[in-house]
Swiss-Prot record:
Lineage top rank: taxon: Eukaryota
GO molecular function: heme binding; iron ion binding; monooxygenase activity; oxidoreductase activity, acting on paired donors, with incorporation or reduction of molecular oxygen
The family this protein is said to belong to: Belongs to the cytochrome P450 family.
Protein name per Swiss-Prot or TrEMBL: Cytochrome P450 71AP13
Record's subcellular location: Membrane
PANTHER family attached to this UniProt entry: CYTOCHROME P450 71A9-LIKE ISOFORM X1, CYTOCHROME P450 FAMILY 71 PROTEIN
One matching Pfam family: p450
The protein's Enzyme Commission number: 1.14.-.-
Natural source organism: Prunus mume
Cited InterPro entries: Cyt_P450, Cyt_P450_CS, Cyt_P450_E_grp-I, Cyt_P450_sf
Length: 514
């Protein structure tokens, strides 16, 4: 669910070069000599995937552009669905078709199940001891098992149904308050996503203020997203990692980590306090602390492990819910017939009841098709979190050497004309009668990844999205402001750890019920 290619790569790189030109010149000279020596000393001939021309030292970094998912699709259209890039010091393979995604995520899943050590992730996620960024091994298998069996099981997801229902009701009240004026729906959806995950993870919301909010939680999240999704030269030139101390990147990471760690320490202290009121339903911190207390295995969880897992759950979950709902409502307002059909279905199932129940959701086939179409065109992470090969493998006749970084362009796969008819059109009808799903078995549609590294929170995320979308469709009639035409909505993407719309969605939401 994260994407960690660079944001505004060329500009960031040029700014760094400008500020530290002498140091970079010396460092790049060393790298150039190193590359020349490496090329001359290579003894074994290998058959690498097709590759565009590269520059000395930086390799193909300059070809990523401001929106790497688009640049990589353009390269795939020219060189094929599997390409080789030299991103600084990092050998990289990018796949952009469902057939080859299956090779990476299923056929060679185990051999390609590790993670590269991302500079920002090491500093934010307790030295990569979370589920997403931890390298493959016994520890990762242990914490993933905890996530699947304890934190995100079907029973656990169901136990949080009251949280989803209460937060959806709060979302509806917030939106209704602005009628007959306009509503910044993007902001409302962001509050909903944050509050659901905060209550599930920590036992309380944040948008209403309180003790935790004095830490500036929302600002911390924004800084975290910027740091994790921004350009980090150490990720492509590991031998030059020392430069982060000079550019200020390392100090920013350390300060953001310190603030999160302080907040998590307070949360854990609150949960362990004997004066804390017993909650009817345990939150995720409760569950992890119980596991930590009971575990007698050779691999007990440390408190830092607990905090890393919680940050993972929260960071991944909020963005997925928010982005999907924001893109979804935007697409529906641009496609009025789809909106009307989805509303008619929901209202036909729910009737005159004001509240959509989770038991209504299995009957909403067309709305589920709408959500699949949102995931196809706007996967939260356009490029899946990179994998790293643990051994040599062969894909499509090409040699993929150990320690190669592997990117899967989920955005390009969702728009591949080899897999989809009229791929740029928003047409949920394509999923009616289709067995294609987004849970990792159909490689044409992989917004949550697949295989061992697939997102374990699919069930939770889907429930959070479906209930909110159904209730919004049921409760309100939706229009754009009089001065805004659907064709003029800004669909510009902001590429980072996830892919947001650059503009807020401003709407008029007319309540159906008094």
């Amino acid at each position: 669910m994260y994407s960690v290619l660079v944001q505004e790569t060329p500009m960031a790189l040029l700014q760094l070069l400008k500020e530290h030109s002498s140091l970079f010149a010396f460092s790049l000279l060393i790298l150039l000599l190193k590359f020349i020596y490496k090329d001359k000393s290579r003894k074994r001939r290998v058959k690498l995937p097709p590759s565009p021309p590269k520059l000395p030292v930086i390799g193909n970094l300059h070809q990523l552009g401001n929106k790497p998912h688009l640049s990589l699709r353009c390269l795939a259209e020219k060189y094929g669905p599997i390409i080789y890039l030299q991103l600084g010091e990092i050998p990289t393979v990018v796949v952009s078709s469902a057939r080859l995604a299956k090779e990476v995520l299923k056929t060679h899943d185990l051999a390609l199940s590790s993670r590269p050590q991302i500079f920002s992730a090491k500093h934010l996620f307790y030295n990569c001891t979370d589920v997403v960024f931890s390298p493959y091994g016994a520890y990762w298998r242990h914490i993933r098992k905890i996530c699947i069996l304890e934190l995100l099981s079907a029973k656990r997801v169901q136990s949080f149904s009251h949280v989803r229902e209460e937060e959806v009701a709060r979302l509806v009240r917030r939106v209704a308050e602005f009628y007959p004026g306009t509503t910044n729906l993007t902001k409302m959806l962001g509050l909903y996503a944050n509050d659901v995950l905060c209550r599930v993870a920590f036992g309380r919301g944040f948008s209403e203020g309180g003790d935790y909010d004095r830490h500036g939680f929302q600002k911390m999240l924004e800084e975290y997203q910027e740091l994790l999704g921004g350009f980090s030269i150490g990720d492509f030139f590991p031998s030059m990692e020392f430069i982060h101390s000079l550019t200020g990147m390392k100090s920013r990471l350390q300060e953001t980590f310190r603030r999160f760690d302080e907040l998590f320490d307070q949360m854990v202290t609150d949960h362990l306090s004997p004066k804390r009121e017993k909650e009817e339903h345990k939150d995720l911190v409760d569950v992890l602390l119980d596991i930590q207390k009971k575990e007698s295995t050779e691999m007990p969880l440390t408190m830092d492990n607990v905090k890393a897992i919680i940050l993972d759950m929260f960071a991944a979950g909020t963005d997925t819910t928010f982005i999907t709902l924001d893109w979804g409502m935007t697409e529906l307002l641009m496609n009025r017939k789809v909106l009307e059909r989805a509303q008619a279905e929901v209202r036909g199932v729910v009737g005159e009841r004001r509240v959509v129940l989770e038991s209504d959701l299995p009957q909403l086939d067309y709305m589920k098709a709408v959500i699949k179409e949102i995931f196809r065109l706007h996967p939260p992470a356009p490029v899946l979190v990179p994998r790293e090969s643990m051994e040599d493998v062969t894909i499509d006749g090409y040699d993929i050497l150990a320690k190669t970084r592997i990117f899967v362009n989920a955005w390009a796969i969702g728009r591949d004309p080899e897999s989809w008819e009229d791929p740029e059109a928003f047409e949920p009808e394509r999923f009616i009668g289709s067995t294609i799903d987004f849970k990792g078995q159909d490689f044409e549609l992989i917004p949550f990844g697949a295989g061992r590294r697939g997102c374990p929170a699919v069930t939770f995320g889907t429930a959070t999205i479906e209930l909110a979308l159904a209730q919004l469709l049921h409760t309100f009639d939706w229009e754009l402001p009089l001065d805004t035409a659907a064709k003029d909505l800004d669909m510009t993407e902001v590429f980072g750890i996830t892919m947001h719309r650059i503009a807020n969605l401003i709407v008029v939401a007319r309540p159906r019920f008094p």
